[in-house]
A protein has these predicted regions:
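C-terminal catalytic "cap/lid" subdomain
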Residues: 1-243
């Protein structure tokens, strides 16, 4: 199998965990990405955040099907993508729709060190129906992974507001008992059946079928330097690997 863009770094910014937190979270993250442009070429992807939950709530009340819900929530992720691209515009970074990311990413990255898009997969109306209910099963985390694997990216990094995967919820009442899991296999992690995960469980299931990406990294974007370290290949946060 040929890696189309073996130098590519896919960096996914959590919608709720980073972008929804406002300037205090977004500003330092964007600043760190800006500094990294000199050494790394990146595809920066965004999630929809809390607004997606509002849309899903209204859409479910209206009886909308899964495919329509997927399209509506992806619009919110796109809005966040435009925001991040605007903050990096001075460096020549722009927002690309999925059609351009799918067919013209290489030429855009030849002109600029990074581009921004949203992480929702382009299934839209053709989204797979879930086993239960109507909520789209493929969301930002899985969409970003599918893009990274399709291009054979060097690194796939998820920027959240937690230090990685914990044995229990670190912000719960008994969060002091939570222990960070520095490295774990995807299948092993699924088998743990943890109450909370910083990424979609479906992403872990997809990893076993990946062609190129054999591990992903979850880092805390609220800690200065974590994104830079991950881009440089250092072990920060949690690394989930194919097992």
């Amino acid at each position: 199998m040929i890696r189309l863009l073996p130098w590519l770094n896919v960096v996914t910014l959590g919608g709720r965990s980073i972008i929804d937190q406002g300037l205090g979270a977004v500003g330092p993250v964007v600043g760190e990405l800006r500094e990294a442009l000199a050494e790394h070429r990146m595809l920066i992807l965004t999630g929809p955040g809390i607004r997606a939950r509002h849309i899903l709530g209204v859409g479910l009340d209206l009886g909308l099907p899964t495919g329509v819900l997927a399209g509506l929530t992806s619009v919110e992720a796109e809005q966040n993508g435009h925001l991040i691209a605007a903050l990096l515009a001075a460096e020549g970074v722009s927002y690309l729709p999925h059609t351009a990311v799918g067919h013209q990413l290489a030429v855009h990255l030849a002109a600029s060190r990074a581009v921004v898009s949203h992480g929702y997969p382009p299934y839209g109306l053709y989204e797979f129906p879930p086993e239960v209910g109507k909520i789209p099963p493929h969301r930002t985390d899985t969409g970003a992974f599918l893009l990274a694997d399709a291009y054979g990216a060097a690194r796939t990094i998820y920027v959240k507001d937690v230090d990685g995967v914990f044995t229990s919820d670190p912000v719960a009442a008994d969060g002091s008992r939570a222990e960070l899991i520095p490295r774990v296999g995807a299948t092993e992690l699924l088998a743990m059946n943890l109450d909370t995960l910083p990424v979609d469980a479906l992403l872990l299931a997809l990893m076993s079928r990946a062609k190129h990406v054999t591990e992903i990294q979850i880092v805390n974007g609220r800690t200065p330097g974590n994104i830079t370290k991950a881009l440089q290949g250092e072990h920060v946060g949690t690394i989930i690997h194919v097992d």
